[in-house]
């Protein structure tokens, strides 16, 4: 059973899943596959692959970063809830907000949270560029993003939401360090400073992952993020 595989792999890292948490992951998989038939949530639907490439992959950052405590976490472009919902299941005290530009995905997440009995979660239908200009600007302890865009673009979408003293966790594939070289200029302009990069392999040769931890040292200038679409079309790079 894939849930037993996940439980065993997490146990090796010192994370013990309760029966309730195991049931939540099993329900999550079931709902993901059901809803995926009517909307495009994921191309990965095989049970073991979901447990490995979505659930385990989402939780792996916690092997290197402490998510314990009542931390506020904003997840940008989480799609079907990765990485923040698996993290919320394992660390129930997290206060999670997911921002996604597609309303259908927000509907799925609302249904998912209700079915899993998750508290302190909210789902916002908005563009990150707009959300980063609003009342929640510079209000989160942690902002995460996984497989959304290149790091230069992600930095402009995510760093404005991080409070001073908080951190942006960029979850990347094997190209993270390469993207980081390009993104250093943008990170600095936006008030960030690269703290650390962790590189690790998923089990079963499922790929290399990198987690880049960026400290928020200074407030972000009010001109960022720029209007929707601009960060992607004209990334902040040194001219």
UniProtKB/Swiss-Prot annotation:
Gene3D superfamilies in the cross-refs: Vaccinia Virus protein VP39
Residues reported to bind S-adenosyl-L-methionine: 77, 82, 128-129, 146
Pfam families per the UniProt record, alphabetical: GidB (PF02527)
Predominant localisation class: cytoplasm
Cellular localization per UniProt: Cytoplasm
Name of the top EC class for this enzyme: transferase
Keywords carried by this UniProt record: Cytoplasm, Methyltransferase, rRNA processing, S-adenosyl-L-methionine, Transferase
InterPro entries: rRNA_ssu_MeTfrase_G, SAM-dependent_MTases_sf
Region described as Disordered: spans on this chain: 217-239
Any single GO CC term annotated in Swiss-Prot or TrEMBL for this entry: cytosol
GO molecular function per UniProt: rRNA (guanine-N7-)-methyltransferase activity
Enzyme Commission identifier(s): 2.1.1.-
PANTHER family found in the cross-reference section: S-ADENOSYL-L-METHIONINE-DEPENDENT METHYLTRANSFERASES SUPERFAMILY PROTEIN
Similarity field: Belongs to the methyltransferase superfamily. RNA methyltransferase RsmG family.
Record function comment: Specifically methylates the N7 position of guanine in position 535 of 16S rRNA.
Protein name, per record: Ribosomal RNA small subunit methyltransferase G
Organism: Staphylococcus epidermidis (strain ATCC 12228 / FDA PCI 1200)
């Amino acid at each position: 059973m894939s849930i037993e595989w996940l439980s065993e792999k997490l146990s090796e890292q010192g994370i013990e899943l309760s029966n309730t948490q195991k049931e939540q992951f099993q329900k999550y998989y079931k709902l993901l596959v059901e809803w995926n038939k009517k909307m495009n949530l994921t191309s990965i639907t095989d049970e073991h692959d979901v447990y490995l490439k979505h659930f385990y992959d989402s939780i792996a950052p916690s092997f290197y970063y402490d998510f314990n405590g009542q931390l506020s976490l904003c997840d940008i472009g989480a799609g079907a809830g990765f990485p923040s919902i698996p993290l919320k299941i394992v660390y129930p005290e997290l206060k999670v907000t997911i921002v996604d530009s597609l309303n259908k995905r927000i509907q799925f997440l609302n249904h998912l949270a209700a079915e899993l009995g998750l508290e302190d979660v909210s789902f916002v239908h908005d563009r990150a560029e707009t959300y980063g200009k609003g009342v929640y600007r510079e209000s989160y302890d942690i902002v995460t993003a996984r497989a959304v865009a290149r790091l230069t673009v992600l930095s402009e979408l995510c760093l404005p939401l991080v409070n001073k003293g908080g951190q942006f966790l960029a979850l990347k594939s094997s190209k993270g360090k390469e993207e980081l070289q390009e993104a250093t200029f943008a990170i600095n302009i936006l008030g960030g400073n690269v703290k650390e990069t962790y590189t690790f392999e998923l089990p079963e040769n499922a790929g290399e992952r990198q987690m880049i931890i960026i400290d928020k040292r200074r407030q972000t200038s009010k001109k960022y993020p720029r209007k929707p679409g601009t960060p992607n079309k004209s990334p902040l790079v040194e001219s």
